[in-house]
Amino acid sequence: MASLTNGFKYDVFLSFKAEDTASDFAGNLYNALKDRGIRTFMDDNKKRENGEKLFKTIEESKTAIIVLSKSYASSLFCLEQLASILDCMKGKRKLVWPVFYNMDPSNVRSKTRTGKLMGVHKAWFNHYKNSLKKTKKALHQVADLSGFHLNNGYYAVFYLLFCVYM
């Protein structure tokens, strides 16, 4: 078991859509953080940690980085994770850092675009209306947070700046 520093098991909880970013941006960010001794939790979306265990891991993390990619909102798993992060971080003075990866933050804010991305879930999970409302609200909340808009290939600069900040 990892040692606790300042009451946290992890310095960073990394949330992302594996198919979009795991092999490049998220993987490189994870390695850059780890190489600098920053304790980072990375769930590659393949393990699909159960909800309780994942929520506990979020609670045990000081900071969350949410890598919002073009298909992040098409994953119900990612949206539920996002809602859990925002619920857990609310009122606990924990940082949430959204990273808009190869997409414009206004696309996340846009009800039309968000509606299109979440349309798949509305059709499949019509009986989970409360869950969908919660995840849609979380998506709008994260879009309003200050974060990083990366779509110009300067990812190494982001890794360095974030690691220096941590």
Question: What are these language model-derived features?
Answer:
Residues S15-E19, R36, D43-N45, V67-K70, ...:
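Structured beta-strand/turn binding interfaces of compact recognition modules in eukaryotic regulators
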Residues K34, E59, L86, H140-A143:
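Alpha-helix boundary recognition
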Residues F13-S15, C78, C88, W124:
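Disulfide-bonded cysteines in secreted/extracellular proteins and peptides
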Residues K56, E60, V67-R109, L117-M118:
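Amphipathic helical hotspot of TIR/SEFIR-family domains
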